[in-house]
Regions:
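GIY-YIG nuclease catalytic motif and its immediate N-terminal context
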Residues: 1-40, 47-71
């Protein structure tokens, strides 16, 4: 890991309509709050609140690697 690189988490949440949403974040707690309340939540989850559970699937050094894993999921 190089100096300055962040750890990114790949996560999945279950929405109120029982669908799944995957994403990446550097701060899982903040991201769950954003999905439930904030304007920064994904458009997909804004219409499917509340989001109760978040499962962290893996972690990566660098956003690009995390997004590649998200795409494969």
């Amino acid at each position: 890991m190089q100096v300055g690189e962040k750890v990114w988490f790949l996560y999945v949440v279950r929405c109120s309509d029982n669908t799944l949403y995957t994403g990446v974040t550097t701060n899982p707690d903040r991201r769950l709050r954003e999905h439930n309340k904030g304007r920064r939540g994904a458009k997909y989850t804004q219409a499917r609140r509340p989001i109760d559970d978040m499962v962290l699937l893996d972690w990566f050094v660098g956003r690009s690697r995390a997004q590649k894993a998200e795409y494969k999921f």
